[in-house]
Each structure stands twice: as C-alpha cells, then as structure tokens.
Design a protein with these regions (language model features):
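Bacterial Sec-dependent N-terminal signal peptides
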Residues: 1-25, 240-242
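Extended soluble regions of mature proteins
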Residues: 20-242
C-alpha cells in the first residue's frame, strides 16, 4: 500500500511538472531614471541635476504580459497601459520568440518611426552563477550577460520549474523561464508579479506593421543612435529601450 501511495505521489509530481510549460506571466518593469542617468558618463552634471529634480526618488512602472508554451513566447504591454488609456501602444511594442526555430520578431519605435525586426535570434552568452533566490514561489538561479552596444550588465533569475527557455524583454536561452531581470544594478528591474500556468492562446495581431530590419541593420541602427547621443551628450534611452 505504501509503495502504491509513493507511486501515485510521484505521478502527480511529474504531471504537475509537465503542466508547467505554458501560461501567462505578468511582469512589472520599473525604471529608475535618476540611477540610469547618473551612470551615464557622457551626460552633463546639469542634465543629471535636472533629472534628479524632476524624478527625485521616483520610478516609472509598467506592466507587461508574457504568454508562452514550448514552441514560443509573446511579450507585450499589460493591463497598466490600458488602465491609463495607452492601449494604442500595445501595437507598437511586441516581441515574438519562436523557440523551435530560434527566430525573433520585434516591433518597436525609435525617433517616432515604427520598425519590425525579423531574423534569427543570436545566442546570448550567459554565465550561470552559484546563487539562488525565490520569486513568486519558484526557486531561481542567477545568470549574467552583457549588452556591449548599450553598455549594460544584465542579471537574470530563472527557474527550471517552468521548463521553457523564454523570458521578458526578448531574453531567452537559459534552462528555464526568466522571472526577473536586473539591468545595471537596479537602473531597471523587470520582475514577475503573477504566474498563471494554464493553456494559453497567443494574442498575435493579424498584421504587424513596421519598417522591416534584419539583425545586422538593427544593431547598426542602435549603434548609430547611441553614438549620436553620446556625441551630443544626450540620454539615448529617452528614445531607445533601456
């Protein structure tokens, strides 16, 4: 009898694990503009002081939804934007990851112009660390990577309890779901606030607009914008995503 109970418990555990590969995660994306701009060496002290005066210790918070299954993930604006009557922005920021083909589609705006990146997704060079923490009841491990174009250090916390190699902001490639990102030591924090593991229907728009770019063109666009902003002593992240 005892062996039967153990077997049933094991089956239930395996069944629960198998059901963890699709659902919807709500993330809160919090930007600390004062920290972000303080860390930019090419900005004038006057510009940094104006930011401190405008923002103080405040942050800018936005909710995003990630719907996922073993084949892919979609990341876009969540309820916060609709509550503040900005639902039109949902059609202007969208990331679709095809996890099977290792391809990505990203819709975004730079300088008031709508772009659409469609290409193979480059493999992120993650370094997994020997640190753990709990997020929304899931045990997570730490991984670190660098964005050399934007000058960012990205810390990710991922959990293999959700066995899908996806995450917010288009970051993928870890052995489990990314539940938190920390960009440049707190300048931006993207953290899961709700995890709903249920069968999902991906909310893909019928037509996704934007000037089409390949990955090399996208990288060149970001590099050019960063270089022009640095030369002009401007904050590039008023226009491009931090």
């Amino acid at each position: 009898m005892k062996s039967i109970i153990i077997a049933l418990l094991l089956i239930a555990h395996l069944s629960a694990q198998s059901q963890n590969d699709q659902g919807t995660i709500v993330y809160n994306r919090q930007i600390n503009y004062v920290k972000m701009m303080t860390d930019l060496p090419y900005l004038s002290e006057e510009e940094k002081d104006r930011t401190k005066l405008s923002w103080g210790s405040g942050t800018w918070d936005t909710n995003y939804n990630l719907t996922f299954d073993p084949n892919g993930a979609i990341y876009t604006y969540g309820k916060t934007e609709r509550e503040y009557n900005y639902s039109w922005r949902q059609d202007e920021f969208l990331i679709i990851d095809d996890l099977k083909k290792a391809e990505q589609m990203k819709q975004f705006v730079i300088g008031g112009r709508l772009y659409l990146l469609e290409d193979e997704k480059p493999r992120t060079k993650w370094k997994i660390k020997n640190e753990i923490r709990e997020i929304e009841g899931y045990l997570c491990m730490k991984a670190v990577t660098e964005d050399t174009i934007k000058g960012q250090t990205i810390v990710a916390w991922f959990s293999d309890q959700i066995p899908v190699a996806a995450g917010p902001e288009g970051y993928t490639g870890l052995p489990g779901m990314i539940l938190m990102l920390d960009i440049n030591d707190g300048a931006a924090i993207i953290e899961a606030t709700t995890v709903d593991l249920a069968v999902v229907q991906h909310p893909i728009p019928k037509k996704i607009k934007g000037k089409k770019l390949e990955l090399t063109e996208y990288d060149a666009l970001i590099e050019k914008f960063m270089a022009e902003s640095i030369e002009g002593e401007r904050n590039p992240f008023w226009e491009i995503r931090y």
